[in-house]
Amino acid sequence: MNLKLSNIILTVISILSLISCQKERQLQLETVKYKQLSFVEGWGDSIFLSQVRDLQFYENRLYISDQYLSQVMETNQYFILNRFIGRQGPGPRDFVSIESIALEDSFLYVFDMGHSAALCFDQKGEFRGKYALLNDRIYMPYRFFVDDSCLYVSTAEKEGLFLEVNMRIGTESHCGKRKDFGEELPNRIRNSRHLLNFEDKCITVSDNIPIVEIYDLKSKQMVDSLDFSDIDYIKKDLIKNENIRKLNSYTKIVSDAYVDGNYLYVLLFGTGSSGEVLSNEILKIELSPILKKKEILQLPGTNYLHICVNQDSIYAYNRKEARVELLVRE
């Protein structure tokens, strides 16, 4: 009897060890190194990038929003300039303080915090209209998107994580469950999200919580989530700054996020051994059929702020060098 019991115990231990080893292997993500193929700092003798706020790639065209220039630049995939979209000025059609951009069916939407509105432009760069929201209702600078004339934007309101605004008829609804941090200030500042569109679903990515969530846009219910707190790049900062996060503040761990095909790309943010800012690794996540960490993409620079992706090519804004780089696998 004791022998049988011993065999059962050994079998259970072996199974648990095997499961543990399998989980450990899953955590060992392959690192893929990228190199710089080309870059752009500006165009001509007077137009230089300095405060890039967003990057988008759509139908072989790259869109760059720059807050200092108060314009959106449209280029081809090799940085050849096609046109400038919008202009700085005091008028209702002019830019004041541009942030994130989004594209839907050849329409470009630019969120301007000066107007507290999403301004719409057609494929020729002509102004088509805008939809205004109060500043204290929304979070910027975070990614937003438009789907079937509905605007999806991260909200500071208690009713949900993000707003769905039907711009045709003006109706609104709140979606997503906010995390409760126990106090009003962290509840307000730590529930911001990057929002990305994927197959009639909304992907939410926090810049201070290591979690990705997917919401169905019809049911407004969360259908999947993924915790990535085990990634070495951010793990040490999460542990080191545990006390700081308790003091009505938060630790930034994500600089940007982008969807291309069936993959989500999360640009991680951390600190080096000497306390220097690092943002040069991307966590690549498979979206369907379930969320799954795939690999780590190592970028050649040290501090990138924004990214967009076209298949295996990455466009990244190098904050230190004030330029947009085209990066490819080594």
For the regions a protein language model found, what residue spans apply to each?
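C-terminal motif of bacterial Sec signal peptides marking the signal peptidase cleavage site
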Residues: 19-20
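Surface-exposed loop and turn segments in beta-propeller and other repeat-based domains
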Residues: 35-47, 85-93, 133-135, 173-188, ...
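Beta-strand-rich domains and repeat architectures in extracellular enzymes and scaffolds
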Residues: 42-70, 268-269
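Beta-rich, blade/repeat-based domains predominating
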Residues: 47-58, 91-104, 136-147, 182-198, ...
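Conserved beta-strand positions in repeat-built beta-propeller and related beta-rich domains
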Residues: 64-68, 110-114, 153-158, 204-207, ...
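Short loop/turn segments that connect beta-strands within beta-propeller blades
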Residues: 76-80, 122-126, 166-170, 216-219, ...
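Loop/turn-rich, solvent-exposed surfaces of beta-rich toroidal or solenoidal domains
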Residues: 247-285
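Blade-level signature of beta-propeller repeat domains, shared across WD40, Kelch, NHL, RCC1
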Residues: 306-330
